[in-house]
Design a protein with these regions (language model features):
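C-terminal regulatory
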Residues: 1-66, 71-96, 123-134
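Short amphipathic alpha-helical coupling segments at ligand-binding clamshell hinges
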Residues: 108-122, 128
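A bilobed periplasmic-binding-protein/Venus flytrap-type ligand-binding module shared by bacterial periplasmic
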Residues: 99-109
Length: 134
C-alpha cells in the first residue's frame, strides 16, 4: 500500500507475504495470525496477499517492494544491514523450531563431533523468528 506503516494495525493496508515453508516446518507457528495477535492487532482478513513455498522467495518479494514479510534474521540480516529491508517493529515471535544432532555413541566421543555439537548449540541459542520486513 501507499500508506506508511506506523503501527502494526497499518499492515491491514499492505500486501502481506506468506511463507508457507514457515507454517509447514515450524511447529505451532501460524505466521501472520500469531504475529498480529502478539502485536494486539484486531482481527482482519490477512489471508490475501502473496504466498510462496520458499522463504528466500518471500524475502526477494519484500526487497522488490511487493509487500511485508515475516522473516528469520538468519536469512535477512545482511539485507537489513545493507538497507534493502527494514524492520518496522521490534516485535519477534519466539523460536519454536528444533535442531537435532544425531550420531552413534562411538562417534559421539570423537572430539570433532563434540566440537561440532558445541558450535551447533551456540548457533541455535541465538535463533529466533523475526518481525515483519518490508
Amino acid at each position: 500500500g501507499d500508506q506508511p506503516i506506523r503501527t502494526p494495525g497499518d499492515l491491514r493496508h499492505h500486501t502481506l507475504i506468506h511463507d508457507e515453508t514457515l507454517i509447514r516446518h515450524w511447529p505451532g507457528s501460524s505466521g501472520w495470525s500469531e504475529w498480529l495477535a502478539l502485536a494486539g492487532v484486531p482481527e482482519f482478513d490477512y489471508s490475501a496477499g502473496l504466498h510462496f513455498d520458499h522463504s528466500d522467495h518471500c524475502v526477494d518479494a519484500a526487497i522488490a517492494g511487493s509487500g511485508v514479510v515475516l522473516g528469520r534474521r538468519s536469512m535477512s540480516s545482511r539485507d537489513l544491514e545493507q538497507g534493502r529491508l527494514i524492520a518496522p517493529f521490534d516485535l519477534d515471535l519466539p523460536f519454536r523450531g528444533g535442531i537435532y544432532s544425531v550420531t552413534t555413541p562411538v562417534k559421539a566421543a570423537n572430539p570433532n563431533v563434540q566440537a561440532f555439537r558445541r558450535w551447533l548449540r551456540e548457533e541455535a541459542s541465538g535463533m529466533e523468528l523475526n518481525s515483519p520486513r518490508s
